[in-house]
Amino acid sequence: RYARVTGVQTCALPILLTEIAREIRVGIIDAVHSAKSGHPGGSLSIADVLTYLYFEEMNIDPKNPKKPDRDRLVLSKGHCAPGLYSALAHRGYFPVEDLKTFRHTDSYLQGHPDMKHTPGVEMTSGSLGQGASTSCGMALANKIDKTSVRIYTILGDGETEEGQVWEAAMFAAHYHLSNLCWLIDFNGLQIDGPIAEVMNPTPYDTKFAAFGWNVIECSAHDFDSIEAAYKAARECTDKPSVIISHSIKGKGVSFMENNVAWHGAAPNDEQYEIAMHDLGER
């Protein structure tokens, strides 16, 4: 529905991106409500980041989704597929109305991303930690081939409790994968509660710095902050970058914000109407 927004006057860019992000959030709620299942909380918390990546940052073409020089996004926190699908739909990879087939039998929009069935999905994901490793492999291959391709990865903060993430972090620094940029969706909540209580993976800044990464922080719901973070990542040419993205789980829907109950639950009809009102659709 939207083309890439590059070329929009700088003063108008955050306004346009904010509207796109709002529509992406509407798509997320439509998807999980239709399926009566799914993961809205963490999908809503990355909606602004997904908006910036797909509509401003990444070199992609929905009309030619397999072009060799395209940038790649790996959604390592694959349970947040509703966010990815809504971003892809609004970017033009498939019809927005198909979001309401999410998790339905025979739909190409299943509960976790599948690179063999869904246009625009670069890596099948859902087993937490694996996207961290596969994105490293993508980055190394493109470094060997001397391409201009950049690899973007989104991980959950709870996901960083997986040991595989830290093995991948060591690998990326060892091979100086400056074409790799991870973003950690730091909303502080996972399915069992606050990450600090379940298995505290912080502090991220000193840990990643010790591993040899370029560490950046941003506000996940401020497009100026997101833009500055990805610009800083691009300017780093000798090591991988990680963005610690401070977010609000369930952002945009009043009763879902900072509420762990909405990690993996769908709104009923009454709650759906409240969510649509919160998102400006009523």
For the regions a language model picked out, list residue spans one by one.
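N-terminal capping segment at the start of a domain
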Residues: 21-37, 185-187
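N-terminal hydrophobic or amphipathic helices/low-complexity stretches enriched
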Residues: 12-24
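Glycine-rich beta-alpha junction loops
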Residues: 79-80, 84, 187-188, 222, ...
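Generic beta-sheet signal
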Residues: 71-73, 149-153, 180, 239-247
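Thiamine diphosphate
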Residues: 120, 124-235
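Cofactor-binding active-site loop characterized by glycine-rich and histidine/acidic residues
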Residues: 28-31, 43-174
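Single conserved hydrophobic/aromatic residue that forms the stacking wall/gate
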Residues: 1-11
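Glycine/aspartate-rich loop-and-adjacent alpha/beta segment that forms the canonical ThDP
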Residues: 223-282
